């Protein structure tokens, strides 16, 4: 239930911290996820970059090279540095914490996928998921 409260706050937050709505930063973050797939053999088949947070479905494989924490740490570290340069600012960019949820069945994976892809609609940013530009798959 705590997650739903946080999600509601994020979806209705003002735009003072909506740095991910900058197209250059959104592209940067999507590109970093792609890089991590190649580099560490984790898969991120569904990603949505919201104005102030990111949703992704991540799948490890039997040959993933590092932990998910390591992958997310690298994504957050390198994109924070580059995003701050784009914005001309310094300091903290991402929240320190991540929220994760293990999907233990194909049904749950499908539910999480739908949730992720529909998040821009739920936040009233677009009327259809496919209209949101900062997502994977397109």
Label for each model-derived stretch:
Residues 1-138:
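Short catalytic/metal-binding and nucleic-acid-binding patches
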